[in-house]
């Protein structure tokens, strides 16, 4: 259903407003370069700084531009269950193929609270839901046992795992079953993630290097890890450079170098230090992008 290289899309801005023309260009470019899905309004899409109206506009524009050519997994997370229900129901109404729902952040629910939250979202709509487990940002870590309980619900179909713990893939295969879709949320470890049983990556770097990331994923899914390692060596400096500062800022800077969108971000994020720009430039050259 969902596999391969799927960019966690940036949200382009110009003069403080959504740049929808740039967003459409990005969607066309991503599909043309081989991305197998699109994931708007996640962390990399600056969802914390989007109004509800902007959030819904971005999802609607991406669904419209994709036009069914690749699946769209719409960001729909919140630390407020009622608000998350709104986002999931909107994603369904507008025609998204699935919703990506982060574990609630800041208010630190228990595992029982996580089950209640995701069960409510499962029951509110008919589209598949992908859990987004990123304890480094949300503070709450969904355990494999909790995920296994949720995987029994028919529309809880997978996880974007950004724990950085490769053992989790095997643990979650045991608790959720081999058909549960496991997608890496961390570019640098995506090779190992797939070797453990993952089937793709919701990627920051794929914003900038979609063809390379898509071909890397194709190699891993074909079991050609020698070829995948060649791609990994080419991409690793870029994975690292993009995340010297917040990854979405690095991705937008790199996209600006390619002429695809402005590097503008919303406060409290700021533009990159010159040293970070130089590192990204060098990594893009190493990857053959410049």
Swiss-Prot record:
UniProt keyword annotations, A-Z: Amino-acid biosynthesis, Cytoplasm, Diaminopimelate biosynthesis, Lyase, Lysine biosynthesis, Schiff base
Reaction(s) catalysed by this chain's protein: L-aspartate 4-semialdehyde + pyruvate = (2S,4S)-4-hydroxy-2,3,4,5-tetrahydrodipicolinate + H2O + H(+)
Pathway(s) per entry: Amino-acid biosynthesis; L-lysine biosynthesis via DAP pathway; (S)-tetrahydrodipicolinate from L-aspartate: step 3/4
Cross-referenced SMART domains: DHDPS (SM01130)
Residues the record lists as binding pyruvate: 44, 202
Top-level taxon of origin: Bacteria
Record-listed E.C. numbers: 4.3.3.7
Active site feature: 132, 160
GO biological process terms held by the UniProt record: diaminopimelate biosynthetic process; lysine biosynthetic process via diaminopimelate
MF-aspect GO terms: 4-hydroxy-tetrahydrodipicolinate synthase activity
GO CC field: cytosol
Record site: Part of a proton relay during catalysis: 43, 106
Cell compartments where the protein resides: Cytoplasm
Description of how the protein assembles with itself and partners: Homotetramer; dimer of dimers.
Similarity annotation: Belongs to the DapA family.
Function of the protein: Catalyzes the condensation of (S)-aspartate-beta-semialdehyde [(S)-ASA] and pyruvate to 4-hydroxy-tetrahydrodipicolinate (HTPA).
Protein name: 4-hydroxy-tetrahydrodipicolinate synthase
Species assigned in the record: Ruegeria pomeroyi (strain ATCC 700808 / DSM 15171 / DSS-3) (Silicibacter pomeroyi)
Source taxonomy: Bacteria, Pseudomonadati, Pseudomonadota, Alphaproteobacteria, Rhodobacterales
